[in-house]
Amino acid sequence: MLTFKEVKTRSIILTLKRPIKAKIAYIKEWPILLIDLYTNEGIVGRSYLQPYIGKSLKYISSIIDDFNEVLQNKKLAPYDNFELMRQSLHFIGYEGLSLTAVSGVDMAIWDAVSKAASQPLCCYLGGTVGPVKAYNSNGLWLEKGNVLSKEAKFLVEQGNFSAIKMRLGRENYNDDLKAIETVKKAIGTDVKLMVDFNQ
């Protein structure tokens, strides 16, 4: 059985090649928080968080650092550890950045216990390893038609994808319909198109 030793975080901010142009924000940089959870037995569980806003990194890191005291020398038991972390935040609240911090450490715990069992996490949880269909969603935000057409072709070619995803949510729904037509024309009938309308 693994026991908790320490959790550390490292913050990085990436400059996006294609900024995110959503209804609610224009994002040029992407924050990532790397999490390393060390056990007394030498196994390291890893995870990462992508909290959207760079300044949130310091708040989440601070919460995660507090979990060192909460979990010190505790056996790694994902469900029990999750509850301990969550309960330690009772007066702060169980949502937003606090639960994001809990989730990051929770993923690192699952990574550590599956490594200790010498299994991929999906197998440790009862699943199987196999091919997974993937699509490219690394673009196609709320851009104009000429940009969308060029980006759509690039996304398909980037990894020989058979499906891509675009975002909707323009002020006028007719502009969304035109954007869909533009992308469909650019990618042809052999590539599937998915959409997000979440802005």
Regions inferred by a protein language model and the residue ranges of each:
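Glycine-rich, aromatic-flanked loop segments that form ligand/cofactor-binding clefts
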Residues: D106-L142
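Structured beta-strand/loop patches that form or line metal/cofactor-binding pockets in enzymes
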Residues: M1-R46, Q50-Y52
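Metal- or metallocofactor-binding catalytic centers and their adjacent structured scaffolds
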Residues: E6, Y38-A116
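Metal-dependent enolase-superfamily TIM-barrel catalytic cores that perform enediolate-based chemistry
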Residues: G127-Q199
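Beta-strand segments within the central parallel beta-sheet cores of soluble alpha/beta enzyme folds
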Residues: E6, E83-L84, C122-G127, N136, ...
